[in-house]
Swiss-Prot record:
Organism: Zancudomyces culisetae
Protein name: Cytochrome c oxidase subunit 2
Keyword match Magnesium: yes
Gene that this sequence comes from: cox2
Function of the protein: Component of the cytochrome c oxidase, the last enzyme in the mitochondrial electron transport chain which drives oxidative phosphorylation. The respiratory chain contains 3 multisubunit complexes succinate dehydrogenase (complex II, CII), ubiquinol-cytochrome c oxidoreductase (cytochrome b-c1 complex, complex III, CIII) and cytochrome c oxidase (complex IV, CIV), that cooperate to transfer electrons derived from NADH and succinate to molecular oxygen, creating an electrochemical gradient over the inner membrane that drives transmembrane transport and the ATP synthase.
Residue sites binding Cu cation A1 per the record: H182, C217, C221, M228
Keyword Iron-sulfur attached: no
Intracellular or extracellular location(s): Mitochondrion inner membrane
Intervals, Mitochondrial matrix compartment: 60-73
């Protein structure tokens, strides 16, 4: 590894014993990561303060004959320990309201992708594009078995057909299910939406950098729930157009 390198290696896939988020590729996920870090900091500070008060009180009042050790009611202290957590929760909730609003907002999209959950694989349809026969681009995405993986690929996360998206483009996912409840989730993009049978749910994203992003079904959907990985490959618009041409079969015949 070159310590003088100006390149940043992003973590877009889960790792063993990982306890933090994957690196974000959207502003929404960056906001979620930042908010989580701030809340964790203040929670740690509160834990230290409250723990110190409790331990100090235990040590002090078990070694003294003061009458306060038998004190079992106090209006002021009860108001304080009731109102203080309420104010803290309110202060924490306000920054999250903006993120919740942005996550639920459906922006005018340039590309719409339909997502259909099955037991146990995903189907995708690019309904904005039609091939020479008038059909839209659609394909199934099935997990690659462990025995068929190539060196460097992730177990239980690789699929035979990936979603390919252009960066710096507003994209909308419309999700539903053909059988049971599934959940379409890609942590690096801040995407998580339920796929419900008989109902359409929508979510928008705007990918800011190239990369390969991994996700999974996040709703227990049966015995092979683990076998529903999601792989999204974000590329430059030029590569995306090349991918479209291949799938639309627009190459002139010789």
């Amino acid at each position: 590894m070159n310590i003088f390198s100006f390149y940043i290696i992003n973590n877009d896939a889960p790792e063993p014993w990982q306890i933090c988020y994957q690196d974000s590729a959207t502003k929404i996920m960056s906001g979620i990561d930042k908010l989580t870090g701030e809340i964790f900091y203040y929670e740690t500070l509160l834990l230290i303060i409250v723990g110190w008060v409790l331990i100090s009180a235990i040590i002090k009042y078990t070694k003294t004959e003061l009458s306060y050790k038998y004190f079992n009611h106090g209006t002021l202290i009860e108001i304080l320990w009731t109102c203080s957590p309420a104010f803290i929760l309110i202060a924490i909730s306000f920054p999250s309201f903006k993120l919740l609003y942005l996550m639920d907002s459906i922006i005018d999209s340039q590309i719409t992708i339909k997502v259909l959950g099955h037991q146990w694989y995903w189907s995708y349809e690019y309904s904005d594009y039609l091939d020479n026969s008038g059909d839209s681009i659609s394909f199934d995405s099935i997990m690659i078995p462990t025995d068929d993986l190539e060196p460097g690929q992730f177990r239980l996360l690789e699929v035979d057909n990936r979603i390919v998206l252009p960066i710096h483009t507003h994209i909308r996912f419309i999700c539903t299910s053909s059988d049971v409840i599934h959940s379409f989730a890609v942590p690096s993009l801040g995407l998580k939406i339920d796929a419900l049978p008989g109902r359409l749910n929508g979510i928008s994203t705007y990918v800011e950098r190239e990369g390969t992003f991994y996700g999974q079904c996040s709703e227990l959907c049966g015995v092979y729930h683990f076998g529903m990985p999601i792989v999204i490959e974000a590329v430059r618009i030029e590569k995306y157009l090349e991918w479209l041409n291949i799938h639309l079969d627009n190459t002139p015949s010789s």
